Amino acid sequence: MRNTLRLAAVFCAVVLIVTGISIKLRRMSSATTAKENRLVVHEWGTFTSIAGKDGVALDWRPLNGVTDLPKFVHTMQDGRGLRHIPNKGDLRAQVRMETPVLYFYSNQEMNISVEVKFPKGKITEWYPQARSLSAGINWGNLKITPGAAFNLPADYSDNHYYAARETDAAPVQVCGTSGKPTEQEKFLFYRGVGSFDLPLSVKLDKDRLTLQNRGSDQIGRVIIFENRDGKTGYRVIDNFSGEIVSERPKLDQNVDTTIRDLRQALVSSGLYEKEADAMIKTWRNSWFEEGLRVFYILPRAITDQTLPLQITPQPAELVRVLVGRTEVITPEMKDAVKKEVSKLNDPSPAVREEARLEIQKLGRFYEPVLKLILEDEKDSVVRARIQRILDSPAIHGE
């Protein structure tokens, strides 16, 4: 009898041990699976606007100029795209949404779906191919392929688009449907234009800038930057709310110092260091060229409201860092353009052509500068010259 009880006790103990080990193994397996299936998504991009005299964003043609993208990128004007208009360069809006890119990180291959809504704008460029472009962009089903050795598209030009690939993100593959080929990239890329309220108002009066946060959330970091005749300077404002008046920056600092503080803001907002470096490398030539501009990190709530993002399955981590870029038209810029406008009726064709080219060196920004000059110009002859330029078609849509 005692032996029977002893055997029963031993048997129960063994059962408990085995059961415990089994439960522990299942938990370890679930934890490992969860870790392997963990999806991390990071995004960066830029909203570019131009401040009017009252601080409100001007209406302009953001795509008026030569394209800065590789030829394989899909556009709404391209026959490969899903929509077609005569000339996307004639689109007018307050804001240019530039190069949002979505990065994906996972330890194993995953199938996901991604859709970005843009209720107050339209998508103008994207890659890889999308399923639809109705009130935003929908890529449909995608495959995340960590470690895959894809031959990524290239047109062998020196283009800032490629800098966004310099991260550890997993390649993304869009399977071809309806005769469209399979396409892959290190990210999902999209651009667009829209008219919507941004939180920061910027107004220049002589050498004083008035900045106003019109939103309900603090703006984590604001950087006022100026490059005038090759000399640069900047000011930093952290945790900004309400209103502040600031002098234009003293031009006694170098661009590398500005980049350091901007990079710190990007990383503090959640981007990986390689992502922040890729963003700065992408936009360095444009962000720090001649001119006065204000950079700021958009509050996340505004990003989500402007660009609602739906990813299935839901990521374990989602970081979205959109940088606002407000261009400020300075008196020096207006004077330089006005000088060239005065040459447009010169008897010499060579002088007129040189003046036209000088004005167009401002690229997509020449039209807003002319509009501001027109507001104050009293000379009817000069006004007529400016109006002729403003009424002309876009320089290039592609």
Predicted regions and their residues:
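Positively charged n-region of N-terminal signal peptides that target proteins for export
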Residues: M1-R6
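Juxtamembrane cytosolic interface motif at the C-terminal end of transmembrane helices
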Residues: G20-R26
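Hydrophobic membrane-insertion alpha-helices, especially the h-region
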Residues: A8-G20
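Conserved hydrophobic register position within alpha-solenoid helical repeats
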Residues: A355-R356, I386
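Helix-centric, low-specificity signal for extended rod-like, repetitive segments
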Residues: I17-G20, N345, D376-K378
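Protease-labile, long low-complexity intrinsically disordered regions enriched in Pro/Ser/Thr
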Residues: R27-K343, A350, K361, F365-E375, ...
